Amino acid sequence: MISKLKMPQPTVNIGMVGHVDHGKSTLTLALTGVKTDTHSEEIKRGISIKLGYADTPVYKCYDASGNPYYTRQPSENCELERVISIVDAPGHETLMATMLSGSALMNGALLVIAANEHCPQPQTREHLTALEIMGIKNIVIVQNKIDLVTRERALESYKEIKAFVKGSIAENAPIIPVSAYHNTNIDILFEAIEKYIPTPEYNEGSDPIMYIARSFDVNKPGTPIDQIKGGIIGGSLTQGSLKIGDEIEIVPGIQNTRGNKTVWTNVTTEVVSLMAGKYSYDMIKPGGLAAVGTKLDPFLTKGDAFTGRIAGYIGKVPPISFSMRLEAHLLKRVVGSDQELNVEPIRAKETLMFTVATANTVGVVSNVKGTDIEVSLKYPVAAFNGMRVAIGRRVLNRWRLIGYGVIESLE
C-alpha cells in the first residue's frame, strides 16, 4: 500500500551534475537513500543513462548542546525544513542532451567534482557551461571522494576548483568536501543546500504547465486486462496545480502518417493518480518531480516516448511549432571536447541540435541575419516566446554545446 500524505510534496528541484564517474549517483544515494541508476543497462555499464530522480526530506535538528545540524533521518528535537527532489543527470559526453533536458527542471544544482582527478575534466566544464547557459545561478560545489586522497591533494584539488570557477556563474559557490561513499560531511552539504538553494516563488494561481521528462508503462507482462494501469508521465509543474480528475492535453501529441504526410495529433486524457516519491496525493503543486497517472494506453507512454512534451489544461497549452526564430548567443570555445576549438558562426543550411525545455530536436538553419537565426525543426516542439534554448553542433562526431538562443517567435 502507498502511504497517503505522509510527507509534504517536494518544493524544489536540484540537479546533480558533473563529469562521468565523479560519484553523482553515489551522492544521490547518500542524500536520499534512493539508488537512481536502476535501468538494466545503467547497472551493467556503471553509468547513468537516463535522468534519475529521488526525493528526500531535510530536517533541522539540535544535539544535546543545542547545536543545529541537518539530516534526512530525524530523531528527537527535529523540524522538517522542506522536501527536495534530486535530478541525477548523466555525466557521459554522449548523453549531454539528456543532461540539458534535465536542466529545464532544475532550480539549483550540485556540481560534483572528484578530488582524485585534475579539475576541470571535459564534462565538468561542459556541465558548468550548461548551468550558465540555462541561467541556473544557485549552485553548491561538492568536492567528492576526499577519502581517496591525501590532505595535500585535497587542498590542491580545492585550489584547482577555485581557479576553474573564477569568473563563472559559480565563482562564489561554496565548496563542500565530502565522501559520498562513507557519508562524510553529508550533514554539512544539507546545510549548504538549505542556505544556497532556496525554494523559488511559484505562480500557483496560473493554469498548470508540466514539462515531461520521463514516461512509463508500469504494467508487468501477463497483467490481466482488468488490472492494467494507464500510462504514466513524469516531470515537473512550473506553475499552477493538477488534481485527480483534471482533463489534460499533451503536446506535441502522437505522430501519424496520412498518405505521404506526417500529422501530429494532440492527446487528451484524465489524471487518475498523482505521486511524488513513494507518496500519493490528491493534488500537486509546482516544485519537485511528480508522476501523473493517466487513462492513456500505456503503449503510448512506454520507454520515455512522451519525454519533451508539455501537459496542461485542454486548450491552455502552447500550440506546436515546426519552426522558430532565435536570438543566438554563441560561446567563444566549444566545451566538452579535449581539444580547444573555437565556435564558428552559425551558417544557413547547417543542422544543429536544440534543447527546448525537456525536448531535444534537430533543426536546419534556414536563415541567418546578424545574431538572429531561423530554424526548421525535424520534430515539432511546444514552447513559449522568451524561453532559453541550448544549441548544440556536431563537432568531432559528438553533439557539443556551442551556445544558447532566446525564442523570439514560433510558427
From Swiss-Prot:
Gene Ontology process terms (BP): formation of translation preinitiation complex
G4 as annotated region, ranges: 144-147
Any one Gene Ontology cellular component term annotated for this protein: cytosol
Class of enzymatic activity (EC top level): hydrolase
Keywords, sorted A to Z: GTP-binding, Hydrolase, Initiation factor, Magnesium, Metal-binding, Nucleotide-binding, Protein biosynthesis
Region annotation G2: where it falls in the sequence: 46-50
Positions contributing to GTP binding: D21, H22, G23, K24, S25, T26, N144, K145, I146, D147, S179, A180, Y181
Pfam families linked: eIF2_C, GTP_EFTU
PANTHER family xrefs: EUKARYOTIC TRANSLATION INITIATION FACTOR 2 SUBUNIT 3 FAMILY MEMBER, EUKARYOTIC TRANSLATION INITIATION FACTOR 2 SUBUNIT 3-RELATED
Name of the protein described by the UniProt record: Translation initiation factor 2 subunit gamma
